[in-house]
Design a protein with these regions (language model features):
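Generic C-terminus detector
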Residues: 549-590
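Active-site phosphate/pyrophosphate-binding segments
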Residues: 253, 259-289, 379-501, 573-590
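Acidic/histidine-rich
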Residues: 153-187, 448-474, 509, 516
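Short, solvent-exposed amphipathic alpha-helical segments in soluble enzyme
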Residues: 20-24, 85, 114, 175-178, ...
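Glycine-rich oxoanion-binding loops at beta->alpha junctions
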Residues: 70-83, 265-279, 303-339, 479-495
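Short helix-capping/linker segments at secondary-structure and domain boundaries
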Residues: 12-13, 134-140, 167-169, 409-418, ...
Length: 590
């Protein structure tokens, strides 16, 4: 899992690549590297650590040239070392490669290639430059050698290659891993996503599975893996680049938390006709299945409740990574709703491919227009919440909920009413941000030494217990467990002891009496209770106030307090909430 970028133009590559990698840092990484091409030589700089530190250690003057590639890496094959950082080169340092994905047949290839060429790393990626070199040594020109090598690779990959044997050119290939071109005047880019090149061009071309591209600074040509040319129209990227900056905030996470009232209002700008058409299709489907991972799965669980309570339609939620094991009943009468912020999540993409192979209709809820998932879907709804840079989902989660509410209200013929209610909710969230932040920061301080947290809720808020626990795990590195409160006595109660923090989501809806009873059981065992409710209760040691709303809307007024609790808990522990260890924003491998 990583971010990749390739540049060819008329300006020195290193600063452009460095800045591009900085914009890709949000994807998560443990090492970084750059290779440039100049005067018949590949210049290489790579190491474990942050982009700025890696480049500083190498000295920019040692990376000349107007063609280059850059990489930020999360280790999947090989430990975190300089040797395993990208780019990887052939033995003569004439070919440099960066790669996102997993080469599934790398052991077979390595066993063959190691008889001819010396390997320097433990990664699967290093087979690629040696494989290209093997084809060159067999007598092929470099371009033909590149295509011959790509055809031998199995697995998922987005690769970019430069070589002294093809000066001034970039070569790239994609299979099951995102790739997009940035087309400018006397400059071209290829990378993982548009943020990497957005300051330089807004014209983009999305590369599909099974395609390669050959680029110079003023031309590009797309091919299939058999080297047959293909045509593709470009699209204009409308994202505001300023949204990808922190502004006056110390972290992206708190900036994106505070953007959520505006995000809800933006979500209400959806096309009513499309929402109504999609609602009709949902109602006509024999079965409706949500497919998602992580925070998106918790949004789907809430969507299931809202579809039932408001839309009077049963649906199911299956983890994307498990979908293939439960897809026996999927057929042409199935509607799959795939949810992914990036639109590139590998497990979701794999599930969608399986669903489409069985004839299912696929709708997607995504943030990134032009993403792989949106292009694969029969219809797509866009979150339109702007770039989300913090690794932990915040505003994208809330935007996902809003679109699910809109679909449910459209299913019940009350779309306009649903929009009016959500507009009211956005104002209530804004008030909560103004009134609760200081109190929540104080609560985080009180619990900064705790290592185990339990989040309890019932009904529609059950998924919020899971989401709250996930946020705390992601940014604070503590054990946190979200569960239906009724399950507490079926095992987890054995873990409650004196001082154990229990976060209870218990608005005064139809679940109130039951969850108060469950909390009381925890209190008797010594739990310290943080209550999130519209009313205080004697069982609470700490109270985070939320407004009173209709039962189905409590997740929307609960989400911000949970996010703030996680954010401030990270801050008081001295952690960077934007870059949780071991996690990536866009999980593009299975």
């Amino acid at each position: 899992m990583c971010g990749i970028i390739g540049y060819v133009g008329d300006k020195p590559a290193v600063e452009i690549l460095k800045n591009a990698l900085t914009r890709l840092e949000y994807r998560g990484y443990d090492s970084a590297g750059i290779a440039t091409l100049d005067n018949g030589k590949v210049h290489l700089c790579k190491n474990k650590g942050k982009v700025a530190d890696v480049i500083a250690d190498c000295n920019i003057k040692n990376l000349p040239g107007c063609t280059g590639i850059g990489h930020v890496r999360w280790a999947t094959h090989g430990t975190v070392t300089r040797e395993n950082a990208h780019p990887h080169c052939d033995a003569s340092t004439e070919i440099a490669v960066i790669h996102n994905g997993i080469i599934e047949n790398y052991e077979e290839l390595k066993n063959r290639l190691a008889k001819k060429y010396k390997f320097q790393s433990d990664t699967d990626t290093e087979v690629i430059p040696h494989l290209i070199r093997e084809q060159v040594d067999s007598g092929l020109n470099f371009e033909d050698a590149f295509f011959a090598a790509v055809r031998q690779l199995q697995g998922s990959f987005a690769i970019i290659v430069i070589s002294t044997l093809a000066d001034g050119k970039l070569f790239a290939a994609r299979k099951d891993s995102p790739m997009v071109l940035g087309i400018g005047k006397d400059v071209n880019f290829v990378g993982s996503d548009v943020l990497s090149f957005l300051p330089y061009t807004r014209e983009a071309v999305y590369i599909e599975d099974g395609e390669c591209v050959v680029m110079t600074k003023n031309s590009f040509q797309i091919y299939d893996f058999d080297h047959h040319p293909k045509q593709r129209a470009s699209v204009n990227i409308t994202w505001d680049l300023s949204e990808a900056g922190k502004g006056d905030y110390p972290h992206f996470m708190i900036k994106e938390i505070k953007e959520q009232p505006a995000v809800i209002r933006q979500a209400l700008m959806q096309d009513d006709r499309q929402l109504n058409r999609m609602a009709i299709d949902i109602l006509r489907s024999r079965q409706v299945i949500f497919v998602a991972c992580g925070s998106s799965r918790f949004a789907a669980l809430i969507g299931r409740y809202v579809f039932s309570k408001v839309g009077h339609t049963f649906s199911d939620v299956i983890m994307a990574s498990e979908f293939g094991y439960f897809s026996d009943s999927v057929d042409k009468n199935t509607l799959v709703i795939a949810i992914s912020q990036s639109g590139e999540t590998a497990d979701v993409m794999n599930g969608v491919k399986q669903a489409k192979a069985k004839g299912a209709t696929v709708y997607s809820i995504v943030n990134v227009e032009g993403s792989s998932l949106s292009r694969m879907s029969d219809k797509a709804l866009y979150l339109s919440c702007g770039p989300e840079i913090g690794v932990a989902a915040t505003k994208s989660f809330t935007a996902q909920l809003c679109l699910l509410y809109l679909l449910a209200y459209a299913m019940d013929g009350r779309l306009i009413e649903g929009k009016e209610k959500l507009l009211e909710i956005s104002s209530l969230i804004e008030e909560g941000l103004q009134n609760n932040t200081t109190e929540i920061a104080a609560i985080a301080e009180k619990f900064k030494d705790k290592k185990d947290f339990y989040f309890l809720a019932r009904g529609i808020n059950f998924a919020m217990a899971g989401e709250g626990a996930l946020k705390l795990k992601e940014v604070c590195y503590v054990h946190a467990e979200g569960m239906a409160a009724g399950e507490l006595k079926h095992g987890t109660l054995a873990l409650i002891e004196d001082g154990t923090p229990v976060v209870a989501i218990c608005p005064t809806d139809y679940t109130y009496a039951d969850i108060v009873s469950n909390i009381s059981e925890a209190v008797v065992r010594g739990a310290t209770v943080i209550g999130i409710s519209n009313t205080n209760h004697s069982v609470f040691n700490e109270w985070i106030k939320i407004p009173e709303v209709e039962m189905v809307f409590y997740p929307l007024v609960t989400v911000v307090p949970l996010q703030l609790l996680a954010y401030h808990s990270a801050i008081v522990r001295g952690l960077d909430p934007d870059k949780p260890r071991n996690l990536a924003k866009s999980v593009t491998v299975k």
